UniProtKB/Swiss-Prot annotation:
Ranges where the record places region Ancestral calcium site: 60-71
Assigned GO CC terms: AnxA2-p11 complex; cell surface; cytoplasm; membrane raft; plasma membrane; plasma membrane protein complex; RNA polymerase II transcription regulator complex
Modified residues (N6-acetyllysine): 23, 28, 54, 57
Subunit and partners: Heterotetramer containing 2 light chains of S100A10/p11 and 2 heavy chains of ANXA2/p36. Interacts with SCN10A. Interacts with TASOR.
Name this protein carries in UniProt: Protein S100-A10
Extra facts: Does not appear to bind calcium. Contains 2 ancestral calcium site related to EF-hand domains that have lost their ability to bind calcium.
Pfam families recorded: S_100
UniProt xrefs under InterPro entries: EF-hand-dom_pair, EF_hand_dom, S100/CaBP7/8-like_CS, S100_Ca-bd_sub
Keyword Lyase carried by entry: no
Protein source organism: Rattus norvegicus (Rat)
Keyword vocabulary terms for this entry: Acetylation
Function as written in the Swiss-Prot or TrEMBL entry: Because S100A10 induces the dimerization of ANXA2/p36, it may function as a regulator of protein phosphorylation in that the ANXA2 monomer is the preferred target (in vitro) of tyrosine-specific kinase.
Domain of life of the organism encoding this protein: Eukaryota
The organism's taxonomic lineage, starting at the top: Eukaryota, Metazoa, Chordata, Craniata, Vertebrata
Domain EF-hand stretches: 47-82
Amino acid sequence: MPSQMEHAMETMMLTFHRFAGEKNYLTKEDLRVLMEREFPGFLENQKDPLAVDKIMKDLDQCRDGKVGFQSFLSLVAGLIIACNDYFVVHMKQKK
């Protein structure tokens, strides 16, 4: 039986490939749909209507309009770090 971490890894891989399809990368539209479906709270809290455009620009280091799996993981890691920072601050406030 997979551990929670193994399940989390599998979920990230499956999510990327579900939105990337056979082409094995995300386009800006793929990324927008993924963000809307998988990170709805993040997008709802963004004040900038161009948030997905800016994220795509940051992730698309080759400037070819494609986001590969490693860049997708960078996005997920950044979001996890931000969530952890928020969590730590709020845990300290509860003490």
